[in-house]
């Protein structure tokens, strides 16, 4: 995918949007060859190269934003003694239009949208064009606009590749509903055109089903979400990992402790791929965001408490709750080579580490186990994973009045993770499966543990209308501040933009 990424397709210009500084700071990609628009889009190979440019923009747009948007406004983290503005404003619910460009600036998103627009315009002009490429372009545009919808609500809506300076290029915000309507329409167009069943790093029929399910779950459209999830699961293309190493290898990119391991597994539906040799320094943003040398945040104590209450790490507490369940976590004694039992959930030990001398110095260790320079980071970002899909389906089934089937899906994951089944201990899980609200909270808790540091928790709280309930007592979040502010510079550069209330 990426080896073609440095070939420029056209002289790319978008003004206004508040993307950069008026006429002198347009959104542009300098042409590296003299190939013109008219000369280029002639063959399916050209279409493939054009899409490579769009996926390159996807890499840049999501390298840190996926985590700043989906993780740090939720209850998984607390500030450290040396907080940094990037995360402090998020954790404290102190967002302003002057907050970090890491999560408020939308330049790279419109670069992605422009490149998708260009492909959507030009591919149908190619004789005997491959509809797969057109489907990918629609899927990429839908993906970008859906996140814009979740973050800002209404945004300037571009459906054509604007190539000239004109008044039409300076647009006000469309309504949130108009943005959502385009997302849903683009998903339909992608469905009509995609032909590839599955692909690790590009949109396919199955990754589109995963995306479609996420969209409908966000909109509380449970029948539609369940239909998409049923089709995805019935494909039998994906399965759960069944041991600690397999689960760890889904995420791990740690050449110091685990050279040559990780970034693969049967649960991965689609990821954004990064490669240091192809993409250069700081290609991915995971090392930058998680496990930094001087942490600006720690894993929240209430998350640790929730995890250890469900799956005790103390042998006595485990034996009390699960007297007939032996531990499945073992670690080798470095001196004797003996395997010693550890109690609890191996996901806990793989996801959280305490490298410092203080017990509360807990950091995310899901992707790497020690501090590694962000300059060499090429960790893939997982967009869709099978366990996420099963838990979404469990949620949907609960809302559709099928709690027993919902618990069966939760137990599929528990069994795969070598954990006791729901309500199997002498101290039952705190859930009445016949109470829809209780079961929803329980499934969200299972998601919190399984999907930690993957960019889901904040959006889970928002889509289930629990953001204020959970975060209000922690940082004073109110309903009107769930939406994000527009970056102040975008408002200066485009006077037609209006700021979100109450910012």
Swiss-Prot record:
Induction comment: By ulvan and rhamnose.
Transmembrane annotation, as ranges: none
Keywords: Cell outer membrane, Coiled coil, Membrane, Signal
Family, as annotated: Belongs to the SusD family.
Name of this chain's protein: SusD-like protein P38
Protein's cellular compartments: Cell outer membrane
Main localization category: membrane
UniProt source species: Formosa agariphila (strain DSM 15362 / KCTC 12365 / LMG 23005 / KMM 3901 / M-2Alg 35-1)
Function: Polysaccharide-binding protein probably involved in ulvan degradation. Ulvan is the main polysaccharide component of the Ulvales (green seaweed) cell wall. It is composed of disaccharide building blocks comprising 3-sulfated rhamnose (Rha3S) linked to D-glucuronic acid (GlcA), L-iduronic acid (IduA), or D-xylose (Xyl). The SusD-like protein may mediate ulvan oligomer-binding before transport in the periplasm for further degradation.
One Pfam family cited in the UniProt record for this chain: SusD-like_3
The keyword Coiled coil appears for this protein: yes
């Amino acid at each position: 995918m990426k080896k073609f990424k440095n070939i420029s397709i056209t002289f790319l210009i978008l003004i206004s949007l508040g993307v950069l500084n008026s006429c002198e700071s347009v959104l542009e990609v300098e042409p590296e060859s003299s190939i013109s628009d008219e000369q280029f889009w002639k063959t399916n190979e050209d279409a493939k190269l054009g899409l490579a440019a769009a996926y390159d923009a996807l890499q840049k747009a999501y390298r840190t934003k996926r985590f700043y948007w989906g993780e740090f406004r939720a209850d998984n983290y607390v500030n450290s003694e040396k907080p940094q503005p990037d995360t402090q404003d998020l954790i404290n619910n102190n967002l302003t239009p002057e907050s970090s460009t890491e999560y408020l600036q939308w330049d790279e998103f419109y670069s992605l949208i422009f490149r998708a627009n260009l492909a959507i315009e030009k591919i149908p002009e190619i004789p005997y064009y491959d509809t797969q490429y057109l489907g990918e372009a629609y899927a990429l545009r839908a993906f970008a606009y859906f996140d814009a919808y979740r973050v800002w609500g209404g945004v300037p809506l571009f459906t054509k590749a604007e190539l000239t300076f004109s008044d039409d290029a300076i647009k006000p915000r469309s309504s949130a509903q108009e943005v959502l309507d385009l997302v849903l329409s683009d998903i339909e167009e992608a469905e009509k055109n995609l032909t590839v069943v599955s692909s690790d790093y590009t949109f396919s029929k199955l990754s589109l089903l995963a995306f479609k399910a996420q969209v409908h779950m966000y909109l509380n459209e449970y029948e539609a979400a369940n239909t998409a999830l049923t089709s995805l699961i019935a494909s039998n293309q994906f399965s759960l990992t069944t041991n600690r190493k397999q689960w760890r290898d889904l995420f791990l990119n740690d050449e110091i402790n685990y050279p040559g391991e990780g970034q693969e597994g049967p649960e991965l539906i689609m990821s954004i791929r990064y490669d240091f040799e192809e993409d250069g320094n700081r290609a991915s943003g995971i090392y930058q965001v998680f496990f930094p040398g001087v942490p600006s945040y720690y894993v929240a104590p209430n998350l640790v408490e929730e995890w250890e209450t469900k799956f005790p790490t103390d042998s006595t507490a485990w034996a009390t709750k699960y007297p007939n369940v032996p531990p499945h976590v073992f670690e080798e004694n470095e001196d004797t080579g003996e395997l010693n039992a550890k109690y609890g959930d191996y996901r806990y030990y793989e996801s959280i580490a305490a490298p410092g001398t203080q017990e509360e110095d807990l950091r995310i260790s899901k992707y790497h186990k020690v501090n590694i320079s962000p300059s060499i980071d090429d960790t893939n970002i997982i967009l869709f994973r099978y366990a996420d899909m099963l838990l979404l389906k469990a949620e949907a089934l609960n809302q559709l009045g099928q709690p027993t089937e919902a618990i069966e899906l939760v137990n599929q994951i528990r069994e795969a993770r070598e954990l006791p089944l729901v309500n199997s201990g002498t101290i039952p899980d705190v859930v009445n499966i016949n109470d829809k609200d209780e079961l929803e909270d329980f499934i969200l808790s299972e998601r919190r543990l399984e999907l930690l540091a993957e960019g889901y928790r904040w959006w889970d709280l928002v889509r289930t209308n629990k953001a204020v309930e959970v975060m209000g007592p922690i940082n004073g979040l109110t309903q009107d501040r769930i939406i994000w502010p527009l970056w102040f510079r975008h408002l200066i550069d485009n006077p037609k933009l209006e700021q979100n209330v109450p910012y």
